[in-house]
Amino acid sequence: MAREKHLDLPIYRPSSWLPGGHAQTIYPAALLWQRPLTYKREHWITPDLDAIGVDWTDGRAGTPLIVLFHGLEGSSRSHYAVSLFHQAYRRGWRGIVPHFRTCGNVPNRLPRSYHAGDSAEVDWILRRLKKNFPETPLFAVGYSLGGNALLKWLGEQGDTANDVIYAAAAVSAPMDLAACGNALDKGINRHLYTREFLGTMRKKAQYKLKLSENPFIDWQQVKQVRTLREFDDLVTAPLHGFFGVEDYWSRASSKSVLKQIAVPTLLINALNDPFMPAHSLPTVQDVSEAVHLLQPREGGHVGFLSGPPPGRLSWLPETILKFFQYHLPLVR
C-alpha cells in the first residue's frame, strides 16, 4: 500500500464566509438547497426476518456500485447522500442506501434497532450485494455513525473484506464513542445537536415498547433523558446486548481495530468537528498502511462547504470518488 502516500486528492478550501465548526456543520445539513434525487425503493428482509428500506440511484450497466451507510437518524435524503450521488451519476456510477433499522420511514418489526458498532448489519448487506452482483466493483462509504460501523466491519474482517469491496471511505466517523458522546452532551452541543437527535430517538424507543411483551426499556425513564449517555444507557445498550453505556461505547468504537484494516480506506475528519475532539482522532500510529488519513483544519461535521455564497458541497464527493476511481483498476 505504499502508493497510498502519493494520492493526489483535492485540497479542501473552506468558504471564508462560513467560519467555525458549528456553522460548517449546520448550514450544509439544514439550510443549503440541493436538487432532490429520485430513488427507487426496495424492501429487504433481514436475516432475522426484520425489514429495512433500500434506496437505489440509476447508473450505467457494468459501472461501480457505491454502498452508503448513513449517520445517526439519517437517510437517503441526507445532504451528504444527495451530493455524493449527484456526482456519482455524472460518472454513470450507481448508488444504494440501505437504511439502518427504524430509518427511511420503514418501521422495523423487532426490538432490535441500530447502533454505532453495528458491523453485523454492514456485513450481511455488503455480502448480499456481492452475491447478487459478483462482477460489479463495490465501494462502501459511511458517514458519521455509519462510518464507525463500516470501519468496525473493516477492522473485524481484515483481509477477507477485500473479497467483498474494492475500497472504502469514512467521513466524520466517531471512532471514539466516549469522546464523541461526552462532547455532544456538553455546552452548546447539547442544545444544537443532542436535543434534535433525542427528539426522534425517544419516539422510536416508545415504538419499541409495542414490539415486545417484556420490553428492555422503561418509557417513564426514557422520557426524562436529556443526554446521549442516558439514552444509550437506558435504550441502546440493553437492546443490543451491551452492559450499559460504558460497555457499549467501548466495544462499539472502531478506533481499536483501525490497525487491522486491509482494504484501501480513506478516513476524512475535520479538526474543528464539534462532535469529535481533535485530540481523539487517530494518527498514523493508530491505523494500518491501508488507511489514508485526511484531516483538514476546517469542515465541521459532515460539512465541508466550499465556494462563495450559497456554497457548494463538491469537495467531499469529488475526493471520495477520486479515491474510489484510483482503486478501481486494482487486480484482485
Task: Tell what function each PLM region has.
Residues 101-139:
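Catalytic nucleophile-loop/oxyanion-hole region of alpha/beta-hydrolase
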Residues 261, 267-269, 273:
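Short beta-strand/loop motif that positions the catalytic acidic residue
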Residues 74-86, 278-280:
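The serine-hydrolase catalytic nucleophile loop
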